[in-house]
């Protein structure tokens, strides 16, 4: 039976978040012929290096997001909220819900809810509610209701509190593409505050060992999704 094409939408707080934490899975699905959309709520511009202004770094990160997505044959959407100032209101929730209705993904990926970074926690709450708003036809918007599966919560060193890996995705076929695409994002290999590439590369190896694969990325799920319903053992 021919496999049905999937559409994966990863929604992060800043350019680089989903590209690092779920990028291997996105590359894996791209290699399988699936459709990829990466949404960033902000560029993540306030971590600007000394040689760039905040405004210049925002422009650079928007370009980096586009180049990363294009390497996967996907699309990038960077919203115009400000880094560190993402509002925890219904306005961004309905904005994301509208994107879900417009692009009709099968699966959502976002941040785990408990983070040291307020934008990450806020994005997680936004996506959970946006999934609900997008799927209920009683919320009348420009496009008809669409329910997307998930969300799956990506593993991020800044979102560690109570994170429990539950779903492991083999990224062996997408690993090299992911590594090449990450070279488009400046801070991944140039940050002096944290060794981003080394951390996430090593983490993919560790999760791969746990999954008995060469490389993997792991995701948490809502506790309600862990229920098993069987007729018998």
Predicted regions mapped to residue ranges:
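Active-site rim/loop-helix segments in enzyme catalytic domains that contact anionic ligands
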Residues: 1-102, 232
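Metal-dependent de-N-acetylase/amidase catalytic core
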Residues: 2-11, 87-233
């Amino acid at each position: 039976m021919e496999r049905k094409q999937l559409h994966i939408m990863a929604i992060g707080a800043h350019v680089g978040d989903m590209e690092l934490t779920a990028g291997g899975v996105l590359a894996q699905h791209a290699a399988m012929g699936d459709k990829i959309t990466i949404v960033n709520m902000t560029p993540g511009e306030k971590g600007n290096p000394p040689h760039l202004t905040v405004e210049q770094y925002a422009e650079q990160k928007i370009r980096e997001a586009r180049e990363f997505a294009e390497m996967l044959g996907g699309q990038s959407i960077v919203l115009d909220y400000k880094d560190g100032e993402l509002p925890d209101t219904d306005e961004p929730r309905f904005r994301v819900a509208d994107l879900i209705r417009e692009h009709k993904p099968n699966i959502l990926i976002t941040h785990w809810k408990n983070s040291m970074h307020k934008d990450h926690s806020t994005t997680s709450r936004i996506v959970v509610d946006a999934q609900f708003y997008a799927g209920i036809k009683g919320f009348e918007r420009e496009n008809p209701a669409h329910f997307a599966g998930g969300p799956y919560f990506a593993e991020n060193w800044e979102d560690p509190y109570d994170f429990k890996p539950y779903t492991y995705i083999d990224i062996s076929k997408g690993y090299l593409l992911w590594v090449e695409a990450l070279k488009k994002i400046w801070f991944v290999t140039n940050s002096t505050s944290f060794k981003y590439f080394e951390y996430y590369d090593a983490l993919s190896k560790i999760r791969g060992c746990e999954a008995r694969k060469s490389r993997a990325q792991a995701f948490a799920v809502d506790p309600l999704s862990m229920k098993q319903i069987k007729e018998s053992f």
